[in-house]
A protein has these predicted regions:
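Soluble, non-membrane globular domain cores that form compact, hydrophobic packing
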Residues: 2-77, 81-282
Length: 282
């Protein structure tokens, strides 16, 4: 499929709950649509997901299109989560994918197994689930993903992990953060939105290992110095009472968390860096 045709399909899908992007009957080795397509826009996601919808909203969720396919007794459920932008799709993917086990030849970031395939492409997070669990169905998950890759244009992504040098990063530990739910996977800094990300600013995190030891580093880029400075001030004022500030610094502070480990908040220009999980005080 040509890029122009893929873009036309994407435009058409935007007005139809993304139905135009779904693989047709007979795709992936003979699977056919089994039930009416379901579309859950906005807050209706709560009617589709039994827990865990909030992280989608934090990153920026628009709608999910759900289609079930059958081939004899085999069944596959395909979910197309349209997010607000490519980084939103990547953020949810990184938080859910675990250790990636890619299939050969699939030109999109993904992880594939016997029971499920998860893929990020453009503004979409795609989840294909093998409902019967038969090993013979696993290739169909990859086949449907190939079909979707041809229909959904790729989108360029900024290198949000550039500040976390590759030679220091622990592979597979990369995550994105746009609010307190994603941040809470690493540390509870305070109530509300401690880093003032507001679902719009995308912070990057990863485990880093160097002379300081192994720790988690979070880098948040703000629109300007004033916004970053205000975020540090707000964070310091609303810091979780279980966190002890050990030393105030010109543009941040050093702390000990509730587990007895150490961390640092530091601002440099319009960027805030948070280090957590240090064995020794910096």
């Amino acid at each position: 499929m040509t890029p122009l045709l893929a873009a036309a399909l994407l435009f058409a899908a935007a007005g139809s709950g993304d139905l135009a992007l779904l693989p047709p009957d007979g795709a992936a080795g003979g699977f056919r649509r089994a039930e009416a397509t379901q579309v859950f826009p906005g807050a209706e996601l709560y009617g589709h997901i039994d827990g865990g919808a909030e992280i989608f909203f934090e990153f920026g969720f628009e709608r999910v299109t759900v289609q079930r396919y059958r081939r004899g007794e085999d069944e596959v459920t395909l979910e197309l989560y349209r997010m607000s932008d490519p980084l939103a799709a990547l953020g949810v993917y990184l938080g859910k994918c675990g250790r990636e086990t890619p299939a050969a030849g699939l030109d999109a970031r993904h992880t594939a197994g016997r029971h499920q395939l998860m893929m990020v492409r453009g503004d979409f997070l795609v989840i294909a689930s093998n409902e019967t669990g038969r090993e013979t169905v696993a290739p169909a998950l990859v086949g449907m993903a190939h079909d979707l890759v041809a229909r959904i244009p790729a989108a360029p992504l900024p290198d949000v992990f550039a500040a976390l040098l590759p030679e220091r990063r622990v592979a597979g530990s990369e995550r994105l953060i746009r609010g307190p739910l994603a941040l809470g996977a690493f540390i509870t800094l305070g109530d509300g939105d401690p880093l003032q990300l507001s679902g719009r600013i995308t912070a990057a995190s990863a485990e880093v290992e160097d002379a300081k030891g192994r720790r988690t580093v979070i880098v948040a880029p703000y629109p300007d110095e004033a916004t970053a400075a205000a975020a540090v001030t707000s964070l310091r004022a609303g810091l979780d009472p279980a966190i002890a500030v050990l030393r105030e610094e010109a543009e941040g502070f050093v702390f000990r968390d509730y587990s007895g480990r150490f961390g640092r908040v530091a601002r440099a220009g319009s960027r805030i860096t948070v280090e957590v999980g240090l064995t020794d005080a910096p």
